[in-house]
């Protein structure tokens, strides 16, 4: 199993954000010692006219605006292809919650994915930070990248019914015939994407284009410099923006880092190893209870998990939902739960349902949440956007042997995710069959100007492993904040040590110590 898992935002961060961040001493907003590396901020490509927009009510994007009455929203038009600025345009949805006091500038946030909506994130975050120095001194701004969320055109490759059918297929048979089937499913998905969205749109959906979009949003805000907080995939976007538009960055925090120098296969293997670590942490916690469905013998945790989940390849598990629990949904639900200990109880409940032959519906709920399926059976486009962006962000090997070798390595580093035995064959990843060529290649991040960036990395982060943060901080020449925890991302999730360091940096440019380490 070599597919990448989407790097989702940690929604629980919004619950505690407002509790720790008030009352910090203030200084003038410019960052002391901020200098630019030679050549940074150069922007090749055809000239594009600065966007014009009007700020209006957010009801077009947000159903309930009662808690964000001061918020204003707009759409910013950007060229689908920046080499043809007068051609087809995409419209980016943007939300801005204005600072309540002396304004230091705009703080743009990106929740990750790729595919997650920053408009929705800001709408949820703003009420939680209403009484803090962040919203007192910064406009809180989110924009949905091209194809994502409330931006148009929305990238959709599947109907709701087609996505449901996709989830019912276990795609676990790695015999030659099974591999042929999986690759045919991937080819059909890729072709559906091209047929429904067009080759040109897919060729320009990548992070390189989104970084240019972000600068168009900066211009629409009227600011020469922005502040930026990127979670997960948002760190990749931040790094790309810094590389192209470094002179327009005042302060940037990258949490849950992606190493831009790593190949897709190596990134996938590293991520799978991270999920295995998180699984082990979950199982150890579960084993404190005699009712744990995985038992108390650590040597048997993986085997017991497979004994519960693998039979779903042949027959769905019981749920109150008539769909039942497929093998794919059980795996996806497990992955979702491993993003945060706050979700572990739902994983335990679902596994107990499988063990007892009763309702395993909590795993289905977790899978629906991950895949963006609502109670009416309608899907967000998060997953389609995730696939389309990652497939053009880096070239993926088409050689089947590379994926057989990857499957063998993944079975070693993440046995809980590996169905059956190694067969000597394995399907290529969706991106290896994607008809649109990659528009970027992996490369180390260039050193940032002094004081431009702070990197945060969590020791047992399943989706963006800790070492990626270490490596990105080294490439950028940036200080690293280490959080000792088992979760995906840490900033504004209630840890006083992390949050205070980040707040001081945004407010007055105070950099954390080079190797700051924060306990849970």
Curated annotation (Swiss-Prot):
GO cellular component, one term: plasma membrane
One Gene Ontology MF term: hydrolase activity
Originating organism: Mycobacterium bovis (strain ATCC BAA-935 / AF2122/97)
Pfam families, sorted: Abhydrolase_1
The keyword Transmembrane belongs to this UniProt entry's keyword annotation: yes
Record-given protein name: Putative hydrolase Mb2247c
Class of enzymatic activity (EC top level): hydrolase
UniProt-annotated catalytic positions: 232 (nucleophile), 461, 488 (proton donor)
Domain AB hydrolase-1: from-to ranges: 105-403
Localisation per UniProt entry: Cell membrane
InterPro entries named in the record: AB_hydrolase_1, AB_hydrolase_fold, Serine_prot/Carboxylest_S33
């Amino acid at each position: 199993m070599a597919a990448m898992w989407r790097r989702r935002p940690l929604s629980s961060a919004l619950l505690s954000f407002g509790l720790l961040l008030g009352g910090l001493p203030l200084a003038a907003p410019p960052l002391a010692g901020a200098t630019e590396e030679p050549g940074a901020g150069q922007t090749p490509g055809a000239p594009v006219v600065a966007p014009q927009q009007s700020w209006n009510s957010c009801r077009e994007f947000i159903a309930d605006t009662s808690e964000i009455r001061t918020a204003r929203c707009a759409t910013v038009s950007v060229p689908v292809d920046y080499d043809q600025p007068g051609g087809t345009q995409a419209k980016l949805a943007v939300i801005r919650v204005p600072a309540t006091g002396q304004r230091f500038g705009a703080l743009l946030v990106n929740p990750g994915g790729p595919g997650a909506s920053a408009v929705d994130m800001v709408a949820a975050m703003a009420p939680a930070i209403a009484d803090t120095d962040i919203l007192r001194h910064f406009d809180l701004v989110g924009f949905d990248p091209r194809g994502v969320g409330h931006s148009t055109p929305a990238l959709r490759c599947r109907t709701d019914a087609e996505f449901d059918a996709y989830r019912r297929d276990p795609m676990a048979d790695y015999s030659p015939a099974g591999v042929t089937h999986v690759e045919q499913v991937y080819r059909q998905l890729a072709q559906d994407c091209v047929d429904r969205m067009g080759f040109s749109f897919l060729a320009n959906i990548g992070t390189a284009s989104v970084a240019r979009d972000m600068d168009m949003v900066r211009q629409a805000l009227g600011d020469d410099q922005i502040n930026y907080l990127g979670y997960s995939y948002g760190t990749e976007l931040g790094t790309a923006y810094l590389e192209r538009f470094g002179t327009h960055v005042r302060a940037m925090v990258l949490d849950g880092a992606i190493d831009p120098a790593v190949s897709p296969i190596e990134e996938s293997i590293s991520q799978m190893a991270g999920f295995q670590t998180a699984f082990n942490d979950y199982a150890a916690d579960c084993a404190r209870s005699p009712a744990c469905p995985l038992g108390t013998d650590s040597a048997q945790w993986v085997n017991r998990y497979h004994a519960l989940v693998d039979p779903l390849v042949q027959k769905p598990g019981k749920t109150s939902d008539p769909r039942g629990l497929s093998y794919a949904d059980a795996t996806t639900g497990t992955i979702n739960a491993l993003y945060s200990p706050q979700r572990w109880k739902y994983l335990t409940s679902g596994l107990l349902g499988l063990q007892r032959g009763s309702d395993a519906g909590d795993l289905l709920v977790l899978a629906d949440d991950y895949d963006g399926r609502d109670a009416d059976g309608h899907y967000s486009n998060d997953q389609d956007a995730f696939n389309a962006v990652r497939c053009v962000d880096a070239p993926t090997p088409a050689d089947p042997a590379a994926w057989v070798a990857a499957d063998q390595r993944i079975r070693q580093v993440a046995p809980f995710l590996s169905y059956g035995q190694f067969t000597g064959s394995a399907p290529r990843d969706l991106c290896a069959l994607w008809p649109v060529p990659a528009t970027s290649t992996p490369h180390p991040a260039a050193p940032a100007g002094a004081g431009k960036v702070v990197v945060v990395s969590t020791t047992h982060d399943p989706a963006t492993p800790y070492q990626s943060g270490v490596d990105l901080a080294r490439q950028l020449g940036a200080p690293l904040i280490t959080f000792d925890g088992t979760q995906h991302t840490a900033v504004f999730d209630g840890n006083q040590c992390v949050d205070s360091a980040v707040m001081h940096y945004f407010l007055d440019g105070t950099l954390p110590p080079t190797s700051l380490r924060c306990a849970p």
